[in-house]
Amino acid sequence: MSKKEKREQKIRENVKNVSLEDFEWLINQYGYIKMGGSHSVAVIKNTSYAYPRKNPMGQPYVKRLIEIIDNR
């Protein structure tokens, strides 16, 4: 298992404790980030998803990101 796969697995297994850095790393694996004011927008395929830039990331934001990735 590569480092990338391990990092993604760690995020998926513990959605309660995900840092902003890990959250944005996961976005960049599947899409890109549009920076804004207090919120940024993750763009994965044809789906846009706004999220607050705070550390650690809230559990609902992480779950929704994983759902978007799995359904792409």
Short names for language-model regions:
Residues 26-48, 54:
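A short, structured beta-strand/loop element
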Residues 24, 28, 35, 59, ...:
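General N-terminal targeting signals
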Residues 2, 46-72:
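Long, intrinsically disordered, low-complexity Ser/Thr/Pro-rich regulatory/activation regions
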